[in-house]
From Swiss-Prot:
Keyword Transferase: yes
Positions of the (+)RNA virus helicase ATP-binding domain: 866-1026
Residues annotated to bind ATP: G899, F900, P901, G902, C903, G904, K905, S906
Single biological process term from Gene Ontology: DNA-templated transcription
UniProt-recorded name of the protein: Non-structural replication polyprotein
Lineage: Viruses, Riboviria, Orthornavirae, Kitrinoviricota, Alsuviricetes
Length: 1776
């Protein structure tokens, strides 16, 4: 450690190299040895494993190997580990001879090689088979022990008496003892099947092999005992799955009281407890210890814990490569375990200051239950002891009790019978019963009492006596003794756990012990050895060797290999018998059974197959229909079972059916016929929603009861000034009773029909938000608009729509105006046949495939056309091909119109294209013939004919609407290619029929056919398939069972010769050319697709007709309105096997089986008539009182709604509030943070005490009033912008032109051109070239992905800048400040507050990807900043590169952000007063500082060109030294350096440069600028103003003598200016104060004036103007005289346009607070300058009303920083 510190101290000196020379010399030889022994390429992730295993690999190898780590381990085993153990001559078994020679060359003691061919693969490994066993005392067995069991090894020792030591290498995963999943998946994987383990090294499946599963038993043995011999087994070393074992002979067995243990290295993990009463495999409960500990602390440290937070925390770790061994089930178990146990806390008390009595009471209260339970069993010993020691219990009893002369207990007689003999007792009792005693004279009675014969009567008398009760029997005594023990058991069962048990259980379950892979070693007992080899070693004769087949072994033999063992030869298993085909009789029986079941007749399945039952009537009727008993599909296969055939009644003409019968006709509350609602209550309804049937109500208001399911009324009432019952009364006034009370209303609730009725009555428009789209209802363009949400359920429910900040994906699709217009378009009272537009994601590979084939001439003819070299079609294809190479996928709206041939797909679209909304269209068709049809139908003027293109020419034209006819006849990928070729396309309308033919390339080299068929890709966009035709005659339509509107009956005939003047459809191009040469009008069937002929067509049948698909045959049969002539070889349509099925059906008049001929047919959503209404009828009703039993402990927390607002808190299961404070919560809420970002927040509570801020009173003199010459703003603005061509300022690269000076459709009123042309405008949304053209100026790239390496100049210049920066602050460069954890904690709070408050919660939620763990934190996303920067440098300027912003990972912002704030607070104390930085200060403070410090009229101003890009590695060195000075922890400094040297973007890796958006951009730029200034000048007390790259120096300080040498090292380009009127941050500064630059302010006012938002921006610009205006007449001394007219023009505009309340700010009196209140209430936009000076209450009001843009420097954060400055003074920090 001391030597390392010394090297660090010498880092900047020349002595470091000499000091490191011995270190380098000592490393040369080991490095060379490592490269020589291990020359293979090793992944970085494997190097720590190999080094920890003691294998000296360098990682600099360059030879590839499929499993390099295993090769390194094997090499180390052989040439390092085994080589030192061969101390005497030794034998080697199962090794290639070449490898044995290398091993023997290292150690000559390897004398003998013994190999045995035991499998077929061994003949390649081993040239010969050994005929004897090893003969030396030491034997090395290479990678074969897993194929032998202990009894075989015992036999080897018995057969080789000289063998003493057997060294074996064993390849077996130790974790296979309890799981089938590897704990090192990057190193090896394996699977277990039965008793076989399949091992795959490093993903190299070609090198995988099988081995017995019980090979793991070798790692569980320490000895092998047998009656013949004892062997000892020892594990010498382990390298992951490779183990070195030693088996020795004859060691005595020493008995031991403890078993030996063996352990293996595995990842640091612990097992989660099993769920209660559930079995969970151990492998899926193993989780990393560090992740568990961090998650355990996290769930108890956060303020609020949501149900998703543990999963989000796990998400941040699950993708780390070091945790690849953890299974997904284990991660799931971990987050579930953490979530469910988060509320659990240990039940402990820490009372240290209790009195002894209180401690005793506390002890008894905690342990009374356990003490009683433990004491009760001892009470059972008392009854037996008492029975043994005593005869019984003496029990006192009352023998006589007399009260009030009445005897209660004892004898009631007067005579004492005991005084008389027993024989006289009856006589005495008789005398007493006769009443003798009362008759005795008193003297006699008294004498008898004295003698003890007669009892004395008294008022109270009590006599007692003792009686002994004997103990019960021993059985009863035993039962009594067992009662306390039983009571103890009972109390222990029902009593709660003791505190100690709770504490132990808490620690055992929530702090489980680490998992160690270890076990005890056992002894293996062998009764008799098994043969080591399953063959005889006697060499056979040559003849016998040739004649005999190779032996087949029953035992799996050992299989040594070169690198890894190979599997044994698999046993031959006879193939299983394939399933026999089902008998034909059984098929017929099954079919007849299905027919009987459909006709409700008994099934004939019980009848024997030999005598089938008669055909039922239903089958006979079916057989009479004109259908094929055997049909032929498109592949020529026979379908033995007939499929459903379309009904021939499709073309019967039926009138439009009336409204369905309902209760309306019998409803007595209404009158008149059943009509549509909009007929009775006419209005302009949305989407035909007023077309539901109803009748006119004839009775007064209905008395229908209020519905129970009234959620629709509740949703509407919440947004209107009516109650639910009032809305119901409106319905009762308008609708019949049958629409108010019916089964639908009672069971399901109210529908949108009722909503339409209410919308007419109250005249409102309703937007219903469903999970898929938004549907408008009610009156169009109504003044009142309400929003309702529709929940699909169950149960379905209406509720008031709440505009949520975040929504589920796809829940709020945005339909373009074009899509809405297409949905509304009607032709012939019918809508277009589609339901909605679809989002098509462009496939760049499809487009690339097509353009490559076109470029090479394989598809299309464009590449073969000639033209000028720079504008030839070939060159256009090459340019388009280059464009596709750099294109990215995007999405575009597509509408698919599909239907049967002749259904009228094109005609409605032609009418749509004639509407104004669709006039900017372009048509793409596959053939010129089809283009001619469109040209004739559209009848466009000559100037618009270019819009009608064939598919190739359409690629080079542009429009926002694309119509593609016969899309399936175009090459695959054409839609993707044309969308990439023209990014302006907003909507694509595709016309086509997937049942017709598709494109086939005629060139054999075309690879277009390898792509997925377009019928599969694009048919998913089909909403409706029009199952009718206007073209086909009835004869053709009946073939397909499709309805036709053609009144012509038509015909299908066979003729012998070509009818004259008719179109001829042929099968091939060659045939078409031949017929055309003979004078016939001929074309191929494929090229006729999309064409319509009024005359009959001729179809030529030849041998090619057998090859055409049913799709092409459908095209041929559906071209004519009249009929079809077949000519040629009629055999091809004879219906025989192998003939054309479609043409056979046409000639025989049999229906076409659509299911068999077209596999896609059953997936098409058929519609049988045009769409007349787009009305969406929704029904819902939800009763909130319904109780749904919860499924778990927190049902409402674990099931989130599809739309989650940012304030959603029902998923919070724990909320930890402030315990010891009554102050309000100052931390911002974190509920809305994504679960992956929340772990990055510390969420600390600030401990900074509040401070009292005081404001000083200005003692400045009263200013003099201004005196301006009159200047009209409008007149000056009219000639301010010179007339010019904005296009000349744009930049053009290739065929792309920038858009920084747009002037088309821009408003202007002041001059002849828009005022926005004054300066370049950066709008990435409308200028796709902005970022691309700016990359070369704003970004600097490093040559490769390797990290940036600091140069010596970087180190020298970085230290030099740091020294001069310290000089500016008056610091010692070598001094450091102790780190202050309390202040850093406050900076963490401040940084998190800034991150949570700088953007809205919805923005943070939408940017959840910024905390995605899959996003490497060294990758930043560069995007262009949208701004219109207007200053002296940009006004009248040309094209300007945009400012690039770097979007970094939240980890970087939240980790390094506190570091920069900590540095800012520390640096604030040392900064001299004469150095001004503008960060966190207002223009008022700038004016005050200028008035106090600036003097004279000599100033040096400086700005830099490309300041951010000019800071190289020296800036990183400089920043790291600044961080080190204030005591920033080393790991944070290293993180900063690592990020700066490894940053990469979507455009490539960047070199060291400043990125706008990285933490501390402004502070580091300001410090760099300040360090350069003090390097250039010798400054003593010259006032300096610094802000980023802008600076002003008051006076002329002398040049530093070292500056010429320093300047050569810098990469900066200075723009130094000496002036008397300096401009700083847009303000002219001077001794009198500061003033806003009138020139720039005038230009901004012009731009705002032309845009029409002057009244929104006027208050902010007025405030900026008032900063200088309030100085009085001296303001004229701050700016040049030629700017006075602009100042006067601004003054003129403010005087005329501002209100009286706004003009108060221009007075010299203090600004009243009411001014800011009025300003905030009337302003829609507030500039940064104005916002910084507003009071806190006004700022909060602006923030709450969303009038505040996201500023880079939040004044609220700066205010909190100022509080920290006053709370942590620098002197106290330095003394701690």
């Amino acid at each position: 450690m001391a030597f390392e510190l010394a090297l660090n101290a010498l880092a900047s000196s020349t002595h470091k190299d000499s000091s490191l020379n011995p270190v380098l010399n000592s490393a040369v030889q080991p490095l060379q040895t490592s490269l020589q022994n291990f020359p293979w390429i090793i992944g970085k992730e494997h190097l720590p494993f190999l080094l920890a295993a003691g294998i000296p690999t360098s990682g600099f190898g360059c030879n590839p190997h499929p499993h390099a780590v295993h090769k390194v381990i094997e090499t180390f085993l052989l040439f390092n580990h085994w080589s030192f153990m061969a101390t005497v001559q030794a034998s080697v078994m199962f090794m290639k001879p070449s490898k044995f020679k290398k091993l023997a060359s290292v150690n000559p003691n390897f004398s003998e090689l013994v190999n045995y061919r035991l499998t077929a693969a061994d003949s390649v490994r081993y040239p010969s088979t050994s005929t004897s066993l090893p003969k030396y005392e030491i034997v090395f067995m290479h990678d074969a022990l897993m194929y032998f069991n202990p009894s075989q090894i015992l036999d080897l020792f018995i057969q080789c008496p000289s063998l003493q030591r057997l060294h074996c290498s064993l390849v077996v995963p130790p974790e296979s003892s309890f799981t089938d999943l590897s704990l090192h998946p990057n190193l090896y994987t394996y699977t277990i099947s039965g008793n076989t383990l399949h091992y795959v090294p490093e993903g190299h499946h070609a090198g995988s092999y099988d081995q017995p599963l019980d090979a793991i038993s070798w790692l569980k043995l320490n000895s092998i005992h047998s009656p013949h011999l004892n062997l000892s087994v020892s594990k010498l070393e382990s390298w992951g799955p490779v183990h070195s074992l030693l088996i020795t002979r004859g060691l005595p067995h020493l008995p031991s009281s403890e078993k030996q243990q063996v352990s293996f290295h595995i990842p640091n993990c612990l097992p989660l407890p099993e769920a209660t009463f559930l079995h969970q495999p151990l492998r899926h409960r193993l989780v990393p210890t560090e992740v568990y500990d961090a998650l355990f602390t996290y769930t108890r440290a956060v303020r609020t814990l949501r149900t998703s937070d543990p999963a989000g925390f796990v998400r941040t770790h699950s993708n780390k490569p070091q945790y690849s061994w953890v299974t997904s089930r284990a991660w799931d178990n971990l987050q579930t375990y953490a979530l469910l146990n988060a509320p659990v806390r240990p039940v402990v008390l820490f009372d240290f200051f209790l009195s002894p009595l209180k401690k005793f009471q506390l002890f008894m209260s905690q342990h009374i239950n356990s003490l009683v339970i433990k004491a009760l069993p001892f009470l059972g010993l008392i009854p037996p002891l008492v029975k043994l020691t005593t005869l019984g219990f003496p029990i006192p009893s009352v023998s006589h009790f007399q009260i009030l002369f009445f005897t209660m207990i004892g004898p009631s007689g007067q005579f004492i019978l005991e005084a008389f003999p027993s024989m006289l007792h009856p006589a005495i009792s008789y005398l007493e019963s006769c009443g003798l005693v009362p008759r005795l004279p008193p003297p006699v009675a008294q004498q008898l009492q004295t003698m003890g014969i007669l009892r004395k009567r008294s008022a109270f008398s009590l006599k007692t006596s003792l009686s002994t009760v004997k103990w019960p029997s021993w059985k009863i005594t035993a039962l009594i003794s067992a009662l306390p023990a039983a009571l103890s058991v009972f109390l222990k069962t029902i009593s709660p756990l003791s505190l100690q048990s709770l504490h132990d259980g808490y620690n055992a379950h929530l702090h489980p012990s680490p998992f160690n892979l270890s076990w005890s070693l056992e002894t293996f007992h062998v009764q008799s050895p098994s043969p080591f080899l399953p063959l005889s070693l006697t060499p056979p004769s040559p003849s016998e060797e040739i004649a005999l087949p190779p032996p087949i072994f029953r035992v799996p033999p050992p299989l040594p290999a070169q690198e890894t063992p190979s599997p044994p030869a698999p046993a031959l298993v006879p193939p299983t018998q394939p399933p026999q085909p089902q008998p034909w009789e059984e098929i017929i029986s099954t079919f007849l059974s299905s027919l009987n079941a459909s006709s409700h007749k008994p099934s004939p399945s019980s009848a024997p197959l030999e005598s089938p039952s008669p055909i039922p009537e239903s089958f006979e009727v079916l057989a009479e229909a004109p259908q094929h008993q055997r049909s032929i599909n498109e592949c020529g296969a026979l379908n033995q079972l007939p499929l459903p055939v379309p009904s021939p009644l499709q073309n019967s003409t039926n009138p439009k059916p009336p409204f369905p019968s309902s209760d309306l006709l019998s409803d007595m509350s209404c009158t008149g016929p059943v009509v549509e609602f909009e007929t009775i209550f006419p209005a302009e309804y949305h989407m035909s929603n007023g077309s539901f049937p109803t009748r006119l109500r004839g009775h007064p208001r209905s008395s229908a009861p209020f519905p129970q399911k009234h959620c629709l009324l509740t949703a509407v009432a919440s947004q209107l000034s009516y109650t639910e019952h009032q809305l119901w009364e409106f319905l009762c006034d308008m609708l019949p009773d049958s629409l108010l009370t019916n089964s639908e209303v009672e069971n399901f609730g109210l529908s949108t029909d009722h909503l339409t009725c209410l919308s007419y009555r109250l005249h409102f428009e309703c937007i219903i938000h469903t999970s898929h789209s938004t549907i408008p209802y009610g009156i169009k363009k109504a003044s009142t608009v309400i929003q309702i949400s529709y929940i699909d359920g169950p149960p379905k429910h209406f509720k008031a729509f709440i505009k949520l900040a975040a929504a589920a994906p796809g829940s709020n699709p945005s339909k373009s105006n074009l899509v809405r217009a297409a949905l509304r378009f009607k032709y012939n009272d019918a809508f277009l046949p589609f339901w909605d537009a679809h989002q098509h994601t462009i496939s760049v590979p499809h487009a690339k495939n097509l353009i490559s084939n076109m470029k090479n001439g394989f598809d299309g003819i464009t590449s073969q056309l000639s033209g000028p070299s720079n504008k030839s079609p070939k060159m256009k294809l090459l340019e388009l091909d280059a464009t596709i190479d750099v294109s990215f996928p995007r999405k575009c709206d597509v509408i698919h119109i599909a239907g049967f041939p002749g259904c009228g797909k094109s005609h409605p679209i032609q009418k749509l294209l004639q509407t104004p909304a669709f006039r900017h269209f372009r048509l793409s068709v596959p053939t010129n013939e089809l283009r001619s049809e469109w040209k004739r139908d559209l009848n466009l003027p000559e100037s618009e004919v270019w819009r009608l293109c064939t598919w190739e020419t359409a690629l080079f034209k542009s429009s926002n609407i694309l119509v593609v006819d016969e899309i399936y006849k175009l090459p695959r990928g054409y839609l993707d290619l044309i969308l990439l070729a023209d990014p302006s396309i907003q909507l694509v309308i595709m016309l086509g029929d997937p049942l017709q033919g598709e494109y086939h390339s005629s060139h054999p080299s075309s690879s277009n056919s390898r792509l997925e068929s377009e019928t599969t890709r694009l048919s998913k966009y089909i909403d409706c398939y029009c199952w009718w035709t206007y073209r086909c005659p009835k004869a053709v339509a009946d073939l397909f069972g499709v309805k036709t509107f053609n009144s012509n009956e038509g015909f299908i005939r066979a003729v012998l010769s070509h009818p004259p003047n008719l179109p001829n459809l042929v099968n091939s191009i060659a045939t078409a050319n031949t017929m055309q040469s003979l004078g016939h009008h001929a074309l191929t069937i494929s090229s006729s697709q999309g064409m319509t002929y009024s005359d009959p067509v001729t179809v030529l049948l030849d041998r090619h007709s057998l090859l055409i698909t049913p799709q092409t045959a459908l095209v041929a049969l559906t071209r004519s309105r009249s009929g079809i002539y077949f000519i040629g070889s009629m055999y091809t349509a004879s219906g025989s096997a192998g003939t054309s099925y479609m043409f056979s059906c046409a000639l025989t008049g049999l229906p076409v089986d659509m299911m068999s001929a077209f596999p896609l047919f059953h997936t098409l959503p058929l519609i049988h008539e045009p769409i007349r209404s787009r009305r969406h009828r929704l029904v819902a009703g939800h009763t909130p009182s319904l109780h749904v039993p919860p499924s778990n402990k927190w049902p409402h927390r674990l099931h989130l709604p599809p739309h989650i607002p940012t304030s959603h808190s029902k998923d919070v299961i724990l909320a930890h509030g402030i315990v010891a404070s009554n102050a309000p919560e100052r931390r911002l809420t974190t509920l809305h943070l994504p679960p992956t970002r929340l772990p990055l927040h510390f969420d600390l509570e600030s401990c900074n005490p509040s401070t009292v801020s005081t404001s000083s009173t200005s003692n400045s003199e009263v200013p003099f009033t201004h005196a301006f010459l009159g200047e009209s703003f409008e007149e000056l603005a009219a000639h301010f912008l010179p007339a010019h061509d904005p296009d000349l300022k744009e930049v053009t690269v290739g065929d792309q032109t920038s858009q920084q000076f747009p002037y088309l459709d821009q408003p202007y009123t002041l001059s002849c051109q828009p005022s926005s042309l004054l300066a370049a405008s950066h709008k990435p949304a409308s200028d796709p070239t902005l970022l691309i053209f700016s990359i070369s100026k704003r970004l600097r790239f490093r040559a490769s992905s390797s990290p940036y390496a600091f140069t010596p100049n970087d180190l020298i210049l970085g230290h030099l800048l740091y020294t001069n920066w310290c000089k500016a602050f008056g610091r010692c460069p070598n001094s450091t400040i102790p780190f202050n954890p309390a202040l850093f904690a406050e900076c963490i709070c401040l940084n998190e507050y800034a991150q949570l408050s700088s953007k809205t919660q919805a923005t943070i939620v939408s940017n959840a990807s910024r905390s995605d763990p899959d996003w490497r934190y060294t990758v930043v996303r560069i995007f262009a900043k949208s701004q219109h920067k207007v200053n002296d440098g940009s006004i009248f300027g040309s094209w300007k590169a945009c400012q690039t912003l770097a979007l970094m990972h939240d980890f970087v912002i939240l980790t390094l952000g506190p570091v920069k704030k900590y540095q800012r607070i520390i640096d604030h104390y040392d900064r001299p007063n004469f150095i001004y930085t503008h960060c966190g200060k207002t223009p008022s403070e700038l004016s005050a500082w200028s008035h106090s410090f600036l003097k004279g009229d000599a100033y040096i101003c400086n700005d830099y060109t490309s300041f951010d890009q000019s800071q190289h590695g020296e800036a990183v060195i400089f920043e790291s030294l600044k961080m080190h000075r204030v005591g920033i922890p080393r790991h944070l400094i290293d993180l900063h350096i690592y990020l700066k040297t490894n940053v990469s973007t979507q455009f490539g890796p960047l070199t060291c440069m400043r990125l706008t958006g990285e933490p501390g951009t402004y502070d580091d730029n300001t410090d760099y600028n300040l360090a350069v200034i003090f390097s250039q000048y010798v400054i003593s007390d010259h006032p300096i103003m610094v802000s980023g790259d802008d600076s002003v120096i008051c006076g002329h300080p002398p040049i530093n003598p070292n500056w010429p040498a320093v300047e050569k090292l810098l990469h900066l380009r200075f723009k130094t200016e000496e002036t008397s009127l300096p401009l700083f941050c847009g303000y002219y500064v001077g001794p009198t104060g500061c003033c806003r630059n009138p020139f720039a302010l005038f230009a901004k006012l012009m731009i705002s004036y032309d845009k029409g938002n002057l009244f929104e921006t006027l208050p902010s610009y007025l405030y900026e103007f008032s900063i200088g205006h309030r100085l009085g007449d001296v303001v004229r001394l701050l700016f040049p005289d030629h700017l006075l007219k602009y100042y006067s023009a601004c003054w003129d505009l403010f005087c005329r346009k501002c209100t009286a309340s706004q003009k108060l700010i221009l007075s010299f009196e203090p600004i009243p607070p009411s001014f800011f209140s009025k300003l905030a209430s009337t302003s829609r936009w507030v500039s940064k300058v104005l916002f910084s000076d507003l009071p806190t209450k006004i700022r909060d009001m602006l923030i709450s009303s969303s009038k505040l843009p996201s500023y880079h420097q939040d004044p609220r954060v700066q205010y909190l920083e100022s509080e920290l400055l006053t709370s942590f003074n620098h002197g106290r920090l330095s003394t701690n």
